[in-house]
Amino acid sequence: MSTSPNKNPQTSAADQYTKPPTDDPFAHEQEGFHKGLGARQLQMIAIGSAIGTGLFLGTGSRLQDAGPMLAVIYAVIGFFGYLILRALGELILHRPSSGSFVSYTREFYGEKAAFVSGWLYWLNWAMTAVADATAIAIYISWFGRYNQFFADIPQWLSAFIVVIVTVALNLISVKLFGELEFWFALIKILALLSFMAVGIWYLVFGEPINGVTPGLSLIAANDGFFPNGILPALIVVQGVVFAYAGIELVGTTSGETKNVEKVIPRAINTVIWRIAIFYVGSVTLLCLLMPYTAYKDAESPFVTFFDAIGIEGTAPIMQLVVITAAASSLNAGLYSTGRILHSMGVAGSAPKFTTKVSRSGVPVAGILLTGVIGLFGVVLNFFVPEQAFEVVLNIASVGTMASWAAIAMSHQKYLKLVGEGKYKRPNYRAPGGRFSDWAVMAFLAIVLVLMALDYPVGTYTLASLLLVIPLLIIGWYTVRDRVNEIARVREGYTGSVPVIAARPVVKKLVSEPRTHIDLDELDLEDEDKPKGS
């Protein structure tokens, strides 16, 4: 971006930013990015982005804890996930942005809220990167049963190599990311469809697996739907939330997608059947095919199934697919955090180096920063390889819930302003309106309570917020003045509804819907440097 002249050698933060040369006050968030994603890629990203380690690896331990009730839990969380995605879809049609819900939080609640939601989202994906790298390392060691070479590779070394290679691929171009995700998603989808086809065959023809006939009788013979009680079944909810992490990626890709108005609704509308088939359908089949006790903590339940039926070569092939799923999730996380950090950087909420975009349209610094945290996972895998996955999964789940809450809150505020005549809704609208948003937030609050009951990992994860919250407060007060200066350069506001740093200052708006409102039409308070809040 251009630099304002300043006679003082100590330039302020605002000197490095200029008022956007457009009526769109958020145009600066998109500078340097390329429209490198087409409908084919986005459709596949929407279908396959959230099919990752949560489903392929985490389901094994969840089945052990919750039993067959896990399928119902997947359906319930899938319903709320769909509501979240429809709300995000309406916000995207309102204004596409690579900053996704962080940019919408900035528009509707101001810079402080954007700072918190942005850094929590980054924490989510940074921890997901650790979980994915850990999962891949576990998957690779599985091949030790066939070749001692794989058994001898330290888990931390596999995680290190995975992080380095994935970061390097993400730094090339958005087009390469789109192609990688297209093929990753296609492999995952074909693998799940293959599993379901084989599983349905065994179910329909009653073919025994390890001497046990699959079907509903299998559930009855193994203590019913709640084999370990109701509370253990409910406590796994946060792990299932992690399995759905990534559905919001379609929002981050919107800023680099061609023909958004047509592509985004079509992509989001595929989600409901994706949830029904790939999540609820596959988990239901797992429950009907084998006893819940047959599944293991550190092994994909899909691999367990193919191992049990004894068809030579199917288990290793599925294990390779599972590695692909984890690599896809890691790839998507690096992509997403790079764009989110860029959006925060141009607003002053993240270090200025995160605004750097390469000639190929890649936010290099933001991706590298997340990659560095991914290397933290290497250390974690060195010291506590057995617990590494569960620890970071719980932390990432908290970040996912914070992201979903930010989307719901932004959407309900947007609809409130629509009701006041300050915005016009697109034709593609979220069902249920503001009621759906409040229902989502109530559900997320319940999940947090259940997470607190999951002693020790869940309890300690929530207790870690006692460290995260003070860090966020310190971070905000560290960057607040810079954020204020940059906001003033952008005409003193962060969105169509004027907000100085973190405080709405509008007394009066014109009655007809507008996409941009001139500062002259507004009555502003506190014209001096804002004190923040």
Show which residues each predicted segment covers.
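C-terminal membrane-solvent junction of multi-pass transporters and transport-like membrane proteins
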Residues: F184, F353-V364, W404-Y455, E491-T494
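Membrane-interface "cap" regions at the ends of multi-pass membrane proteins
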Residues: M1-G60, Q64-M69, Y82, R86, ...
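Membrane-interface loop-to-helix entry segments
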Residues: P154-T213, I268-I272, L393-A406, S436-A439, ...
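Hydrophobic alpha-helical segments and their helix-loop junctions in multi-pass secondary transporters
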Residues: I187-A221, T284-L289, W404-G421, V479-N484
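Hydrophobic, membrane-embedded alpha-helices of multi-pass small-molecule transporters
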Residues: L37-F56, S61, V162-V165, I219-V280, ...
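A generic transmembrane alpha-helix motif of multi-pass inner-membrane proteins
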Residues: F195, Y202-L203, V391, I395-S403, ...
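Extracellular loop-to-transmembrane helix junctions
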Residues: F33-L37, I47, L57-S158, V271-A276, ...
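TM-loop-TM module centered on a large, flexible mid-protein loop between adjacent transmembrane helices
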Residues: S103-T105, G110, W142-N147, S217-D223, ...
